[in-house]
């Protein structure tokens, strides 16, 4: 088997390259042009980039072997994540690599504003000695407003508490318990802006956060307040910021990121009460080393068949959660395989209900696994855990998930109901030491889903079971086990047969023609 190939398209730390060379053939081309990349990418299984190289939809569609796009850093603005997801390509990054580095840079910019370090430095270099001009303020006793309490925001809290700052936080996702543990006050955005002496931003750029801080927000702030942005350009409306600084609505700003980079022609360049750095928040040797090692290890993990931790376009879980879910991942795959073969027509809807302990767990990966098993047999394009939901959506398949605390005496149950243009099919299953089907179309059974099975709907009348057995015997097909589920004598029933041989389609057709048999299907697991 040939080795995997990895393209390093931007400069990364040598330690990351060394890690990759243990499991793959590594090609380093840190000056590759977009045109060259478009031609070369077809030969690679993974690509590592920083911020220079753009991995566009065009590049992704020219990469039949590509399995992983790795960003040696945090932001993936230069990667078309949707296109990667559609193709089933993992997008991974190294979010923890820059947390401390960016937090320290943010605090450095706060100090630069508070003590007017940048303009004081410039003044001395111009031969001046203007001590009275550069009267600053202490951070001690001031109120810091942090917008976003993720990895970086949390690191800012730890460090600014040492300065003696009072800390307010705006983050809709932080729990009261977590806030109390960190010793911060959670509040709404308006209150934070009104009461903070310094505001620092640590949220991603999304449609919701674009121009989160604009004209109205600056009017809420103290005229002595500073604002710092080391997150993403575009979160602050730079035109509104310029007006707020010119009109004295706030005292100063420090930016490491911009709406356009570099910010050529920006009026902010003219202002003395602005500190600007060229997007270097993550630029320390330690952060670059850590980012390279983290993504290299993630790629190694994938190549060796393991589960990576930092995938942006599929569920990520810790090892304990994965261990708890692993039996149900196998179960969901088998359920999907049964649905794919038993459901007549083209699937239009899939409803999955998680009962018992599973209802409290991270079950998205189970739905993805089931979708993958349903879609793979009917599509020519590859389906995996990453692209299964997007492929289902593209094909107009409605997928819903629900949770239920009751589980009929079992620890956990998965109930999957599929509908198509020609009917429906449902399967209910649990894990009792091994995967077990406990219901078919609402009828109780007890079957281990493995090998070749025949599922038949029939009317529970004398001689019907015998006729099915005889018909199979005529074709040399031996029945290993049989399960029957019924609700009343003489009514509709479901039979699940496990047989020792594959069942030809023509034999199934003969079974379906037997008296009192409504339908039958052969299932291969």
From Swiss-Prot:
Active site (record annotation): 232, 261, 279 (proton donor)
Transmembrane segments annotated in the record for this chain: none
Keyword Amino-acid biosynthesis included in the entry's annotation: yes
Binding site for NAD(+): 151-152, 171, 230-232, 256, 279-282
SUPFAM superfamilies in the record: ACT-like, Formate/glycerate dehydrogenase catalytic domain-like, NAD(P)-binding Rossmann-fold domains, Serine metabolism enzymes domain
Pathway the protein contributes to: Amino-acid biosynthesis; L-serine biosynthesis; L-serine from 3-phospho-D-glycerate: step 1/3
Keywords, sorted A to Z: Amino-acid biosynthesis, NAD, Oxidoreductase, Serine biosynthesis
Enzyme category, top tier: oxidoreductase
Single GO molecular function: phosphoglycerate dehydrogenase activity
InterPro entries with a match to the protein in the record: ACT-like_dom_sf (IPR045865), ACT_dom (IPR002912), ASB_dom_sf (IPR029009), D-2-hydroxyacid_DH (IPR050857), D-isomer_2_OHA_DH_cat_dom (IPR006139), D-isomer_DH_CS (IPR029753), D-isomer_DH_CS1 (IPR029752), D-isomer_DH_NAD-bd (IPR006140)
Keyword NAD: yes
The family this protein is said to belong to: Belongs to the D-isomer specific 2-hydroxyacid dehydrogenase family.
Protein name listed in UniProt: D-3-phosphoglycerate dehydrogenase
Lineage: Archaea, Methanobacteriati, Methanobacteriota, Methanomada group, Methanobacteria
Name of the gene: serA
């Amino acid at each position: 088997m040939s080795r995997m190939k990895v393209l390093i398209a931007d400069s990364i730390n040598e330690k990351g390259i060394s890690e990759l060379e243990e499991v793959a053939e590594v090609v380093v081309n840190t000056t590759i042009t977009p045109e060259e990349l478009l031609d070369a990418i077809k030969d690679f299984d993974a690509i590592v980039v920083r911020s220079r190289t753009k991995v566009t939809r065009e590049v992704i569609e020219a990469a039949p072997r590509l399995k992983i796009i790795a960003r040696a850093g945090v932001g993936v603005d230069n990667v078309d994540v949707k296109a990667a997801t559609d193709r089933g390509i993992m997008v991974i990054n190294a979010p923890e690599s820059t947390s401390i580095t960016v937090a320290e840079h943010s605090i450095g910019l706060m100090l630069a504003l508070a003590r007017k370090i940048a303009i004081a430095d410039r003044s001395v270099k111009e031969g001046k000695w203007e001590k009275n001009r550069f009267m600053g303020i202490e951070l001690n006793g001031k109120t810091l407003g942090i917008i976003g309490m993720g990895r970086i925001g949390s690191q800012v809290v730890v460090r600014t508490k040492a300065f003696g700052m009072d800390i307010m936080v705006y983050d809709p996702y932080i729990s009261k318990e977590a806030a109390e543990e960190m010793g911060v006050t959670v509040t709404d955005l308006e209150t934070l802006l009104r009461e903070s002496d310094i505001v620092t931003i640590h949220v991603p750029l999304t449609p919701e956060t674009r121009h989160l801080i604009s004209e109205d927000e600056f009017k809420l702030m103290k005229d002595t307040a500073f604002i710092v942005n080391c997150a993403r350009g575009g979160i602050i409306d730079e035109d509104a910021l310029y007006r707020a600084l010119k009109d004295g609505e706030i005292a100063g700003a420090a930016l490491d990121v911009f709406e356009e980079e570099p910010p050529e022609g920006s009026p902010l360049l003219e202002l003395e009460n602005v500190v600007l750095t060229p997007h270097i928040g993550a630029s320390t040797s330690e952060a670059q080393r850590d980012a390279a090692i983290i993504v290299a290890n993630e790629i190694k993990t994938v190549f060796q068949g393991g589960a990576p931790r930092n995938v942006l376009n599929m569920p990520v879980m810790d090892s304990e959660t994965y261990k708890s879910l692993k039996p149900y991942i196998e179960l969901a795959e088998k359920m999907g395989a049964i649905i794919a073969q038993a459901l007549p027509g083209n699937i239009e809807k899939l409803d999955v209900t998680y009962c018992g302990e599973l209802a409290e767990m991270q079950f998205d990966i189970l739905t993805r696994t089931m979708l993958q098993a349903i879609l793979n047999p009917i599509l020519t394009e590859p389906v995996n855990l990453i692209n299964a939901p997007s492929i289902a959506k593209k094909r107009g398949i409605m997928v819903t998930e629900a949770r239920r605390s009751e589980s009929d005496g079992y620890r956990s149950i998965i109930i999957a109901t599929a509908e198509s243009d020609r009917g429906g099919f449902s399967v209910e299953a649990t894990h009792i030491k091994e995967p077990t089907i406990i219901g078919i179309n609402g009828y109780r059974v007890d079957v281990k889903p493995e090998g070749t099975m025949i599922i038949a709907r029939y009317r529970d009348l004398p001689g019907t079971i015998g006729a099915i057995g005889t018909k199979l015997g005529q074709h040399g097909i031996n029945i290993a086990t049989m399960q029957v589920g019924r609700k009343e004598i003489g009514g509709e029933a479901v039979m699940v047969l496990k047989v020792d041989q594959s069942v030809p389609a023509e034999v199934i057709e003969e079974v379906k023609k037997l008296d009192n048999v409504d339908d039958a299907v052969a299932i291969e697991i």
